Every structure is written in C-alpha cells, then in structure tokens.
A protein has these predicted regions:
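Acidic, metal-coordinating helix/loop segments flanking the phosphotransfer/catalytic sites
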Residues: 38-56
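Receiver (REC) domain active-site loop signature in two-component systems and cognate sites
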Residues: 63
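A Lys-centered signature of the CheY-like receiver
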Residues: 112
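Two-component/phosphorelay signaling modules centered on CheY-like receiver
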Residues: 18-37
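Conserved acidic carboxylate
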Residues: 15
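Non-catalytic signal-transmission and effector/linker regions of two-component phosphorelay proteins
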Residues: 1-12, 117-130
Length: 130
C-alpha cells in the first residue's frame, strides 16, 4: 500500500438517510476498501470525530438540525480545528451552492444520487487533485 493510499483510508460519513448510509457503507467499505464510520447527524459526527480520527470527512448537505455546512463550521471551530479534507455530497449543485461549499473549505462535491461502484474512485480523484 502506498503512502497516499494509507493517508486516506479512514472516512467519516455524515448522512441522515439510513438507506443512503447503507449504500454508502457498501460503496466505501466493500467496494472502496476504506475504513468508514457512518454518523446519522452532525452532532454525532462532533461526538465521534476525535475518537475515530478520520483522514477525510464526507458530508451530506441537507440534514435536519445541523446541516452539512453547519456541521463543517462546527468541526472547524473545535479546539484544534479540522485538519482533514472535506467533501460534500448533495443534489444541490447550482454554481452558487458549489461556490459556497468551496468557500467553507470543501475540496469538492460529489453529486447525489451517487454510483456506489465509483464513489471511492471519485473521492480518491478529489483528494489527488489537492
């Protein structure tokens, strides 16, 4: 395994929809070979991030309570901030929305619905472009 592959093996995915979480788990773990922790809310991600120590955070944009952008801001405001890349997953893909995600610090956006067979490849490509 190369250093690059090791660098991004742990993904924290935040998604409120249990069906999408289940498909994403298959895509990330079984197809992609990542170690993944899936959280149902931004609040849960805040509780788990230090214990899990992800190499990348994958965030749904539209969630009840704390949405994806609010979750990212909360993660950034923690003691020590957020030192790993963030990718948003969303169906909200207007140019102004994508610009907002990038201004918040995301390295990219993966459109929903996503293809479980290519999700890991999309993530690796975004990381490689950084």
């Amino acid at each position: 395994m190369t250093a690059s592959a090791r660098q991004f093996e742990r993904i924290l995915y935040v998604e409120d929809d249990p069906d999408i979480r289940a498909v994403a788990e298959l895509a990330l773990v079984d197809v992609g070979g990542f170690v993944a922790l899936l959280c149902e809310s931004g609040q849960r991600a805040l509780e788990e991030i230090d214990r899990f120590q992800p190499d990348l955070v994958l965030l749904d944009v539209m969630m009840p309570g704390m949405d994806g952008p609010e979750t990212l801001q909360a993660l950034q405001q923690r003691a020590g901030g957020l030192s790993v890349p963030v990718v948003f997953m969303t169906a909200r893909l207007q140019p102004s929305e994508i610009q907002e995600y990038e201004e918040l610090g995301a390295i990219g956006v993966i459109p929903k619905p996503f293809d479980p067979m290519t999700l890991a490849e999309q993530i690796r490509r975004l990381v490689a472009e950084q």
